[in-house]
Amino acid sequence: MREILHVQGGQCGNQIGSKFWEVICDEHGVDPTGKYNGDGSSDIQLERIDVYYNEASGGRYVPRAVLMDLEPGTMDSIRSGPIGQIFRPDNFVFGQSGAGNNWAKGHYTEGAELIDAVLDVVRKEAENCDCLQGFQVCHSLGGGTGSGMGTLLISKIREEYPDRMMMTFSVFPSPKVSDTVVEPYNATLSVHQLVENADECMVLDNEALYDICFRTLKLTTPSFGDLNHLISATMSGVTCCLRFPGQLNSDLRKLAVNLIPFPRLHFFMVGFAPLTSRGSQQYVSLTVPELTQQMWDAKNMMCAADPRHGRYLTASAMFRGKMSTKEVDEQMMNVQNKNSSYFVEWIPNNVKSSVCDIPPRGLKTSSTFIGNSTSIQEMFRRVSEQFTAMFRRKAFLHWYTGEGMDEMEFTEAESNMNDLVAEYQQYQDATVEDEEEYEGEEGLDENYET
C-alpha cells in the first residue's frame, strides 16, 4: 500500500515524533510491545496499518520510523518512555557530540559525519516498501540538529528519491518565547533549504501552541507534553485518509496538488478542532457547523500568523467521524461565501475537503485544517528582521564560519527568505488591480456590441 516513512531529528523532532507514535499506536490498537489488541470486531484498524508500520515476525507491528540526533539524551528518554520498546533498535541513529544549537555543525560537520548512517537506515526502510508514497520529517528550525542535519537529510533524500513526496512538520522559532539567541540564523538557513527541497511544510510554533493551551484549554502551566499533544493530533489528522476508509480520500500528493498553486509557496498553517486538553477528551461531540467554525478560527492556528492579515490561496479540511458529506460541502461553501474577501478570487473553489469515517480516539467527530495563506509571511518577516539585525553586526558569525561556512551563504539565505515574503505579498495583492483591468475590458466589449 501507500507507505509513509517517518523521520524525526533533534530533541524537538524526537519529542513530537514519539508523541505522534503514541497517538497512531492508540488509533490502530497496537500496544507498547507492538502486539495488536484492538477491537476484534472489525479489521478497520489493521486494514491499512502498513501505511506507518512494518509487520515483523510473531505478528508484531514495528513503526517505519527513523530516529536521529547528535546526542544520546533524547533517544535514551524515548527508549525508556511509554512506547520505547516498539521501535526497531537499529533505527536509532545518534552521535555523541551534539550540535550545540549550531546549524553549521548539524549541516556541515557533526551532522555530515552521521548522515550516511541515517541514510542507510532510510534506504533499508524504503526498500521494504511496496509503493513508498513519501517521507514525513519532524524537526525544529531553531536548534542545530533538527534544522541543520534535518535539512541535510531532506536534501539527500531528495537526491535519491526525487519523485516521492517530502512533507515536513517544522517548528519555527516563536516571536516571544525564544530558546536560543541564534534561532534567527538557524531558521533562515533552514528555510533556504526547505523552499527548495520540501514539497509541503506544516508550520508550527510554540507560542501559538502555548496560546491555545492558555486561552482555549485553560491550562495554567502548559508543558511541552501538552504542546506535542496538539501537534500529534494534527499530524494524525493529516494522514487519517490514508489509514482508514473514507468517503472522500486524500493522500500526500493530492494534498499538494490541491494546496500549492506556485511551487515555492508550500508553507501551510495548520489547525485542529475540537481543541481538547489531554485529560478531557471523552466529553466532546461537535456538529459539522461547530467544527467548521472552530477550525477556521484564527485562534486555532498552530503558528503565530493571523490569517485575517492575509488571504487564503487554498485550503484543505479533513473531517473525521460519521457525518454527511453534503453537510460538509455546504459548511465549507458557507465559510467561503461569508468571508470571500479572505480568499483570493482568482482561484475559484479553493477549499478542498475530505471525510474519513473513523474519528480519533475519544472523540465522535474532529477536523484538521491546512491552509495556504499569504499571512504566513508574517512569520518569515519576523525571523528575517531578527536575522538582519544580528547579521548586520556579524554577531555570533564566528561559530558558523568556524565550522567552514561562508558569509555568502548567509546572504543567499537572507535574500531567498525575503524573496519568499515578496512572493506571498505579490499574490496577496494580485487581485484588485488585475480585476479592474479585466472589468474595464469587459465594459468596453459591452459598449462595442451595442
Curated annotation (Swiss-Prot):
Chain positions recorded as Mg(2+) binding sites: 71
CDD domains per the UniProt record, alphabetical: beta_tubulin
InterPro entries: Beta-tubulin_BS, Beta_tubulin, Tub_FtsZ_C, Tubulin, Tubulin/FtsZ-like_C, Tubulin/FtsZ_2-layer-sand-dom, Tubulin/FtsZ_GTPase_sf, Tubulin_C
Residue ranges, annotated region (Disordered): 429-450
Biological process, per Gene Ontology: microtubule cytoskeleton organization; mitotic cell cycle
Entry's Gene Ontology cellular component terms: cytoplasm; microtubule
Gene Ontology molecular function, alphabetical: GTP binding; GTPase activity; metal ion binding; structural constituent of cytoskeleton
Pfam family name, one: Tubulin_C
SMART domains: Tubulin, Tubulin_C
Main location: cytoplasm
Annotated keywords: Cytoplasm, Cytoskeleton, GTP-binding, Magnesium, Metal-binding, Microtubule, Nucleotide-binding
Biased composition (Acidic residues): 431-450
Compartment(s) where it occurs, according to its Swiss-Prot or TrEMBL record: Cytoplasm, Cytoskeleton
Residues annotated for GTP binding in this entry: 11, 71, 140, 144-146, 206, 228
Cofactor: Mg(2+)
Family: Belongs to the tubulin family.
Role played: Tubulin is the major constituent of microtubules, a cylinder consisting of laterally associated linear protofilaments composed of alpha- and beta-tubulin heterodimers. Microtubules grow by the addition of GTP-tubulin dimers to the microtubule end, where a stabilizing cap forms. Below the cap, tubulin dimers are in GDP-bound state, owing to GTPase activity of alpha-tubulin.
PANTHER family to which the protein is assigned, alphabetical: TUBULIN
Quaternary structure (record): Dimer of alpha and beta chains. A typical microtubule is a hollow water-filled tube with an outer diameter of 25 nm and an inner diameter of 15 nM. Alpha-beta heterodimers associate head-to-tail to form protofilaments running lengthwise along the microtubule wall with the beta-tubulin subunit facing the microtubule plus end conferring a structural polarity. Microtubules usually have 13 protofilaments but different protofilament numbers can be found in some organisms and specialized cells.
Name recorded for this polypeptide: Tubulin beta-6 chain
Naturally occurring in which organism (per UniProt): Gossypium hirsutum (Upland cotton)
